[in-house]
């Protein structure tokens, strides 16, 4: 169980899932899930496509951050409806691979957008903590539903 489940309304642990926000209000946000994006074509012309270095996971976070850095805005729109065929992104089929890919993509995302802002010792600490988180997450697999 992650901290997002223990503290569902805490912005620190739930910013990606937007659980801390009123789901009935349209609002500007720092990012949204790639499974429910509507994007103007002009934005692709401005910033490019999704970054293919992200095989699985974090491609949406990377895209939203690049959108914001280039002066565009990202909105959560509660009335928008999208049919997401399939879902789960393969997480049920191979949970070990999904966990590994999530952590690898998060590492790439951090390295691309944030590592240059910190000194090497902090980055090493961050990478070590991510590795520990990966190992601990693997230990939780038998307890998942």
Model-assigned labels for residue ranges:
Residues 1-29:
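Short, flexible, basic/aromatic active-site loop/helix in glycosyltransferases
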Residues 2, 7, 131, 144-145:
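Short, flexible coil/linker elements and helix-boundary hinge sites characteristic
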Residues 11, 15, 40, 46-47, ...:
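Residues in flexible loops and secondary-structure boundaries
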Residues 21-81:
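A short, conserved alpha-helix in the catalytic core of glycosyltransferases
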Residues 65-144:
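Active-site-adjacent helix/loop segment of glycosyltransferases
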């Amino acid at each position: 169980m992650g901290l997002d489940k223990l503290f569902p309304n805490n912005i620190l642990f739930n910013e990606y899932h937007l659980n801390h926000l009123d789901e009935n209000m349209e609002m500007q946000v720092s990012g949204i899930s790639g499974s429910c994006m509507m994007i103007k074509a002009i934005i692709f012309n401005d910033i490019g496509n999704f970054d293919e270095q992200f095989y699985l996971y974090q491609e949406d976070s990377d895209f939203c951050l690049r959108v914001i850095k280039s002066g565009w805005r990202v909105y959560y729109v509660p009335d928008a409806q999208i049919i997401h065929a399939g879902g789960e992104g393969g997480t049920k089929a191979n949970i070990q691979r999904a966990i590994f890919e999530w952590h690898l993509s998060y590492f790439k995302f951090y390295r691309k957008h944030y590592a240059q802002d910190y000194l090497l010792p902090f980055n090493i600490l961050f990478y070590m903590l991510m590795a520990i988180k990966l190992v601990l997450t693997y230990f939780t697999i038998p307890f998942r539903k």
